[in-house]
């Protein structure tokens, strides 16, 4: 629960990707700072080395929550491939107009193109908008290093979908446009939860939606089947939202899209899981799309141009 995690005081542990790890010798690193006229400190040390990620323990003296500490000392975590320090304008520019909850290490950048005026105009023309929550994990920045993409271990991300959103998805079958790969991963994780219900497995029993869990679902189990099963499950328990975690990896390895029909997404860097997702959605056309973007000087990555992919 991110709200509780940010509300702790004094000490906590987080799973982190650590840059310049070789420079971190044994012991702790310390930041000394002033808060409300008093000298304070923040200390951090590696509690456990877990390969790509490390468990880092934080301890601080100031009378503030961990969330307040991050706001006070932290910087906007702009993507490392921008090769610059964060700037004051990033606090508004690197944020969607519809964001509500803290927890992501990156903004869903396809949504940066949407303004209140654009959303209002689209609603006036009959387009419906529904919101989902995905706390984007730091692993989204990790490149796919193995030649065999199937060997790339996916990170875990937590998500939340409201009952009203599931009702809206059922009302417009075949007309779902996901804004960003973040929304795609969230929506496409729902059939895995529904299949657990269908097969009598506790919805949260096995842990996060597994990296390849969706590939094992029978092809004739449709998105509508999944949404109806989830809705019945929620209504039977009086739930107004589903909270879960996912490690879903959408790649051109026979993935079957069940919920999403169209995607609005920026242009992604090579050797990324995001480009694998685009390839799985667009098929071999992804090369033609990216060749066109490159030859016409489209801007790539977070502050770049966007695209609308349709099936």
Where are these regions (language model features)?
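Surface-exposed, charge/polar-rich loops and edge strands
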Residues: 1-311
């Amino acid at each position: 629960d991110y709200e509780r995690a940010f509300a702790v005081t004094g000490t906590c542990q987080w799973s982190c990707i650590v840059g310049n790890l070789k420079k971190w010798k044994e012991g702790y690193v310390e930041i000394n700072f002033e808060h409300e006229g008093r000298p304070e400190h923040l200390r951090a040390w590696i509690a456990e080395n877990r390969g790509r990620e490390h468990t880092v323990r934080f301890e601080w003296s100031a009378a503030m929550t961990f969330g307040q500490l991050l706001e006070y000392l932290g910087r906007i975590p702009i993507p490392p491939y921008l090769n610059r320090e964060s700037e004051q304008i990033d606090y508004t520019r690197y944020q969607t107009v519809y964001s509500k909850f803290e927890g992501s290490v990156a903004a869903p950048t396809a949504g940066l193109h949407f303004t209140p005026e654009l959303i209002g105009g689209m609603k006036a023309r009959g387009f419906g908008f529904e919101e989902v929550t995905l706390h984007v994990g730091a692993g989204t920045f990790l490149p796919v290093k193995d030649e065999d993409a199937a060997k790339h271990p996916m990170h875990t991300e937590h998500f939340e979908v409201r009952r009203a959103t599931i009702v809206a998805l059922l009302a417009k079958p075949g007309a779902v446009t996901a804004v960003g790969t973040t929304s795609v991963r969230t929506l496409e994780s729902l059939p895995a939860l529904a299949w657990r219900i269908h097969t009598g497995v506790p919805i949260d029993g096995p842990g996060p939606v597994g990296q390849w869990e969706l590939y094992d679902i029978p092809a004739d189990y449709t998105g509508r089947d999944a949404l109806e099963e989830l809705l019945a499950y929620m209504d039977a328990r009086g739930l107004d939202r589903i909270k879960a975690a996912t490690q879903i990896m959408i790649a051109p390895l026979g993935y079957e899209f069940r919920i999403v029909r169209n995607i609005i997404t920026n242009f992604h860097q090579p050797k990324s899981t995001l480009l694998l997702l685009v390839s799985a959605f667009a098929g071999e056309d992804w090369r033609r799309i990216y060749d066109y973007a490159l030859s016409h000087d489209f801007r790539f990555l977070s502050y770049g141009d966007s695209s609308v992919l349709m099936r």
